[in-house]
C-alpha cells in the first residue's frame, strides 16, 4: 500500500483558456486589401506551483498579420492547464513542465486562436505543430548564455546583469 503512494503521478486536472484578445486596428478598410498578409507567430511557455504537487502550466501565442505596413489583426491567447505531478525526480520536473504540459495544452490553444481569427472575418490561420523539446532546449541555452554574460553573478530586478 505504501508503494502506491510513491508511484510517479502525472494527471491533468483542468485545461482552460486563461486569456484571449483580438485587435483589428485597421478594420473595416483592411478587408478591402487584396494582398495576402504576412503572419508572425510568437510563443512563450510558463509554469508555476499552485500547491504541493499541483502546477499551472501556460502556453501563450501571439499571431500578428500585416498587409504592407498595416496590422490586419493581432491575436494573443494564453491556454493554461492545472496538473497534479507527484513523485517525479527533481531533474525531470522542469522538462515535464516545459515540454510535457505544453504538449497537452497547445492543441486547445491552437483551436481557440484559429476560431478567434475566423470569427473576426479573416481566412483561417493554421498554426503548425511546435516541438516543445527544441523550444525548451533553446530556452536553456539562452539562459546559460545570459548567465555566462553576467560577469558579477548578480542579476538586477529588471533581469539585467549588475555592472562594476
UniProtKB/Swiss-Prot annotation:
Gene Ontology terms, MF aspect: unfolded protein binding
InterPro entries, per database record: SecB (IPR003708), SecB-like_sf (IPR035958)
Locations listed in the record: Cytoplasm
Gene3D superfamilies per record: SecB-like
SUPFAM superfamilies assigned: SecB-like (SSF54611)
Highest taxon in the source lineage: Bacteria
Gene Ontology cellular component annotations, sorted alphabetically: cytoplasm
One record GO biological process: protein folding
Similarity-based family: Belongs to the SecB family.
Protein name (Swiss-Prot/TrEMBL): Protein-export protein SecB
Gene source species: Janthinobacterium sp. (strain Marseille) (Minibacterium massiliensis)
Lineage, opening ranks: Bacteria, Pseudomonadati, Pseudomonadota, Betaproteobacteria, Burkholderiales
Amino acid at each position: 500500500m505504501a508503494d502506491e503512494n510513491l508511484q510517479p503521478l502525472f494527471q491533468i486536472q483542468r485545461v482552460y483558456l486563461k486569456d484571449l484578445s483580438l485587435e483589428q486596428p485597421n478594420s473595416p478598410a483592411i478587408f478591402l486589401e487584396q494582398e495576402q498578409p504576412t503572419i508572425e507567430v510568437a510563443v512563450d511557455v510558463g509554469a508555476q506551483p499552485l500547491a504541493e504537487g499541483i502546477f499551472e502550466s501556460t502556453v501563450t501565442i501571439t499571431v500578428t498579420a500585416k498587409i504592407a505596413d498595416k496590422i490586419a489583426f493581432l491575436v494573443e491567447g494564453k491556454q493554461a492547464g492545472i496538473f497534479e505531478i507527484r513523485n517525479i525526480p527533481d531533474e525531470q520536473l522542469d522538462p515535464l513542465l516545459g515540454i510535457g504540459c505544453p504538449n497537452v495544452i497547445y492543441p486547445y490553444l491552437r483551436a481557440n486562436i484559429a476560431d478567434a481569427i475566423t470569427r473576426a472575418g479573416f481566412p483561417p490561420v493554421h498554426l503548425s505543430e511546435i516541438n516543445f523539446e527544441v523550444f525548451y532546449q533553446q530556452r536553456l541555452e539562452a539562459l546559460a548564455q545570459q548567465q555566462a554574460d553576467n560577469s558579477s553573478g548578480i542579476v538586477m530586478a529588471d533581469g539585467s546583469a549588475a555592472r562594476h
